[in-house]
Amino acid sequence: PVIECDDEIVANEIFEVKVGLGKEVAHPNTTEHHIRWIRLYFHPEDAKYPYEIGNFEFNAHGESSAGPNEGSVYAHHQVTAQMKTAQPGTLHAMAFCNIHGLWENSKELGIK
């Protein structure tokens, strides 16, 4: 997953974090091959455990009683979360592809 946000944020001010897949090459979004979920965590420096920021499920991939990919609704595998923190640390994103399994990425977050 690609994590997009400023490298440094202002302590205790809300900021946006975008997480998605396929920024350079589009990831398939079909009944047979899709991203099922994205999870975002923040691990403050010197903290023992991370905090879960969000758990996002994508449940529509063109399914239909008429058959695979015959439905008209597709959830897109990108999310925007808002958060704030007083500490620097690391953002961790995980995404699950029903074919290729778990993908992970991280990004350091500093405080101005």
PLM regions with names:
Residues P1-V10:
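Short, compositionally biased P/S/T/A/G/V-rich stretches that sit at domain boundaries
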Residues I14, A86-H92:
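Extracellular Ig-like/FN3 beta-sandwich strand-entry sites
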Residues G20-T31:
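Short amphipathic, basic-aromatic surface patches that mediate peripheral association
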Residues Y51-P68:
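Solvent-exposed serine/threonine-rich low-complexity stretches and specific carbohydrate-binding patches
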Residues N69-T80:
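Aromatic sugar-binding surface patches on proteins
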Residues V79-Q87:
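Short, hydrophobic beta-strand segments
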Residues F96-S106:
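Short acidic/polar inter-strand loop motif in beta-rich domains
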